[in-house]
Each structure stands twice: as C-alpha cells, then as structure tokens.
Curated annotation (Swiss-Prot):
Key word ATP-binding present: yes
Similarity comment: family membership: Belongs to the pseudomonas-type ThrB family.
Protein's organism: Brucella abortus (strain 2308)
Domain of life, source organism: Bacteria
Protein's recorded name: Homoserine kinase
Length: 326
C-alpha cells in the first residue's frame, strides 16, 4: 500500500456521500507499498480501506480484482470485501482516479515471520487456490516471463549503477528462464504478491490475505515460489530451509504438488526472484523524490537470484516427498 495521490477532506466527504458507511471521523494515508494510493478511513460505522487506483492499475482489471475478493469470501477465505455504493457500483471516481472502498481486515502483518506463520501461509495459499478454482473470470499475468525482458530494458542502461555486474547477471538469468520456463503446469487464480505485509495474523492464526491487485490467472506453483522468496529468507539473505519446509508442508497438506510442479519449483523460484528484482529496480531508478512511498531495495532480490542459481532440486527448498502427488 502507498500514497501517490493526496486528497482533502472536502473531496473525500463528497465521495463518501455515495456510500452508506456512516460519518467520517478521521483518515490517514498508508505509506507502505508501491502501486496504488491507500487511505485508512475511520467512520461511525467502523474502519475501511480506500484505494485510489494509479496508472499502473488498468481500470478494466478492477472488476476482476473486486469480483475475486467477493468470490473468495463466499468460499470461506478471509479477505477484504468491496463496499457497494448506493448506486450498486463498486467503483467510483476520486481526485481524477478510479477508487473503491473495502472492508478492514483485523490483524497485523508479521515483520519477523516464524515457522508457524510460514506453515499457516502455505496452508492459506492452497485454500485460496482451491477456492478460486471456479472463479469465472480470467486475467493475464502482466508481470510474467514475456514481460520481464521489456521491463528489464527500461532499467538496463542504469542497472550497473546499482550493482556492478548486474547487467550481465540479469541477462544470464533471463536467458536461462526463457529456455527453461515450464509449460503445461496446473493454472488458476493466484495472488502473485503474497508478501508478509499482505497476510494478517492474530497471534499465530492467519486472519486473512489482503491486496489482490496483482491477482491473475497463472501457474499455481508460481504462487508458491513467490512465497518461498518472500517468507523464507532471513535478514542476512540466507535461505531458512526450516521455514521453507513449513510453508511447503502447509501448502501440500491441502493441495499436494504434482511431480511436474515439484520439478519446476527451482525454475519458478528463480523466475519469481527476477520478477521482483526487476520491478524494484525500475522503481528504485524512477520513483520521484518526495513521493510518499517507501522504495524497496532491488539488491535483496539480486541476492535471492544468486541463491536460486545454486539449487538443484525442490528438496533443497524443504519439499518433502509426501507433499508430492504420486
């Protein structure tokens, strides 16, 4: 979550007249994240999240994102729910941006996830994949293999100013991924951005997932690979195999991986690291000074890329044979 677009109380009040959520008592911007502008609203009826969709978010995708949240909730998954306006729509206009309000999800994200948190996230992710199996809408992943090289080309010229040799490293990784990216793996709705700040907990209990604005239709095991990158590396960039095993155990206890998915996991994990390095690198080089946004260091994912190059099997991530379907 982040804030790119400032709003004032007058225009917010006019926007809220289209909703039946009580009287506004306070609001504040949420600085974390990089994509859209987000505000926490407190009203006489409760707490809500207001999102203004910035230029990276295609308005045509909003029915998919908001409809997915509704669908998953109906299937029993805890996640924010879009608040319907008085005219029956879910999307309005505020400060020249498409905007929506969703319910507030109780809980906190874990800055230092434990093994128990990792297992709960893996289990929750598998439940999300199953719950989304009959979601009727589809959305192409706009940040997958065919998109990585064009994105890289936007930053390539300046990449070595961030880390000497980064151009050569990234070119080699992209060449490898283009030659080895798996085909014909099970696909469905994936979150695609399930970082610790997008999973809320009450103690060790998972209270739900948020921020579905990268959700799309893609390889299910790729979502697992994203989580291995996001949840199982320590501050010193070492991979915590115990956390990886817990996350994979949680996932496969609900949805076992096929043998093909297990074999592809090392390529998918390497690809996920490249994907997040590329978007972080682009933001690092282009987000304007003074923007109310916390930029994220692309080098965190360069170090993950280096780790994945050494992996030879999914067992090194902690995958146990009982988690693989015969």
């Amino acid at each position: 979550m982040a804030v790119y677009t400032d709003i004032n109380e007058i225009e917010l009040g006019a926007f809220l007249r289209h909703y039946d959520i009580g009287t506004l008592t306070s609001y504040k911007g949420i600085a974390e994240g990089v994509e859209n502008s987000n505000y926490l609203l407190h009203t006489s009826s409760g707490s809500f999240i207001l999102t203004l969709y910035e230029k990276r978010t295609n308005r045509e995708d909003l029915p998919f994102f908001l409809g997915l949240m509704q669908h998953l909730a109906k299937r029993g998954l805890e996640c924010p729910q879009p608040v319907v306006r008085n005219d029956g729509a879910m999307i309005g206009q505020l400060a020249g941006r498409p905007a929506a309000i969703v319910t507030f999800l109780e809980g906190m994200w874990m800055r230092r996830p434990t093994v128990a948190h990792c297992e709960a996230v893996g289990e929750g992710l598998a439940h999300m994949h199953l719950a989304g199996a009959d979601f009727p809408m589809r959305r192409r992943n706009g940040l997958t293999l065919p998109d990585w090289r064009p994105l890289w080309n936007l930053s390539r010229k300046c990449a070595d100013t961030v880390e000497r040799g980064l151009v050569a490293e990234t070119e080699a990784d992209l060449d490898f991924l283009e030659k080895n990216w798996p085909a014909d793996l099970p696909q469905g709705v994936i979150h695609a951005d399930l970082f610790p700040d997008n999973a809320f907990f009450l103690g060790d209990r998972l209270s739900g997932f948020i921020d579905f604005y990268f959700a799309c239709t893609d390889i299910l095991a790729y979502d697992v690979a994203v989580c291995l990158n996001a949840w199982c590396f320590e501050k010193d960039f070492s991979y915590n195999r115990t956390k990886g095993a817990a996350l994979l155990r949680g996932y496969t206890s609900v949805r076992p991986l096929s043998e093909a998915e297990a074999d592809a996991l090392l390529v998918l994990a390497r690809g996920a690291a490249v994907r997040f390095m590329l978007t972080r690198l682009y933001d690092w080089l282009t987000v304007p000074a003074g923007s109310f946004v916390v930029k994220k260091d692309p080098m965190e994912y360069v170090r993950r890329m280096r780790f994945h190059r050494q992996i030879e099997s999914a067992a090194e991530y902690g995958l146990e044979m009982q988690g693989v379907a015969a």
